[in-house]
Amino acid sequence: MNVLSCSINTLIKEGLYEISGVEVGQHFYWQIGGFQVHAQVLITSWVVIAILLGSAVLAIRNPQTIPTDGQNFFEFVLEFIRDVSQTQIGEEYGPWVPFIGTLFLFIFVSNWSGALLPWKIIQLPQGELAAPTNDINTTVALALLTSVAYFYAGLSKKGLGYFSKYIQPTPILLPINILEDFTKPLSLSFRLFGNILADELVVVVLVSLVPLVVPIPVMFLGLFTSGIQALIFATLAAAYIGESMEGHH
């Protein structure tokens, strides 16, 4: 028992700590208290948030009875997000529109910022700026938020009866059903991170090999796939929330 206890303590103190320290690429750090944070991720995330907040201010400023072109655009975006939420969640989609919309818009603008904004012009002491979703920490954080959201949705709708889904349709599936809830955020985070990182790497390689014409179509393809990835993430998040409220599917 002592050996087993020591092994578990070693895994918790060393193994999990090492796993949490896995990094991709070089990073510029800020020291905040006793923690090191990835400064470039915070910088680019703040830029994306500023763009979204500025757009929101423009959207609600001086609304017209006869919508202008800009107002039409923002209303179209809102209707699109509402349709995605309603399709995946069902009749009780209303309270979840802000959450799904925030996920979609943050990921969409983050992905596009990696292709459209000249991050490389800004020099850092170490590492370089890139899209926030190009960092595994961002995508994991978004996936964990989604996990918290669908657990909250299920518990608020069904109370402790929510956990009965783990033994449906048979208690034999209990380990698999529990494992499924852990794999959902992993699949969300790694899918988004992998696609955005791969897209930026392909563009960088092509620019280094053929700097003029060839990378342009790839960049346009990257813009398209970036939008698709944002839609997939938001759609799956809404589907998970809807599933937790409706029951085991």
Swiss-Prot record:
Topology relative to the membrane: Multi-pass membrane protein
Organism expressing this protein natively: Lepidium virginicum (Virginia pepperweed)
Name under which the protein is recorded: ATP synthase subunit a, chloroplastic
Molecular function in Gene Ontology: proton-transporting ATP synthase activity, rotational mechanism
Localization: Plastid, Chloroplast thylakoid membrane
Function (record text): Key component of the proton channel; it plays a direct role in the translocation of protons across the membrane.
PANTHER family assigned to the protein according to its UniProt record, in alphabetical order: ATP SYNTHASE SUBUNIT A, CHLOROPLASTIC
InterPro entries the record matches: ATP_syn_F0_a_bact/chloroplast, ATP_synth_F0_asu, ATP_synth_F0_asu_AS, F0_ATP_A_sf
Family, per entry: Belongs to the ATPase A chain family.
Keyword Endoplasmic reticulum: no
An example Gene Ontology CC term for this record: chloroplast thylakoid membrane
PROSITE patterns: ATPASE_A
Pfam families (alphabetical): ATP-synt_A (PF00119)
Transmembrane parts of this sequence: 40-60, 97-117, 136-156, 201-221, 222-242
Record's keyword terms, sorted: ATP synthesis, CF(0), Chloroplast, Hydrogen ion transport, Ion transport, Membrane, Plastid, Thylakoid, Transmembrane, Transmembrane helix, Transport
Keyword Iron (UniProt): no
Lineage: Eukaryota, Viridiplantae, Streptophyta, Embryophyta, Tracheophyta
Main localisation: plastid
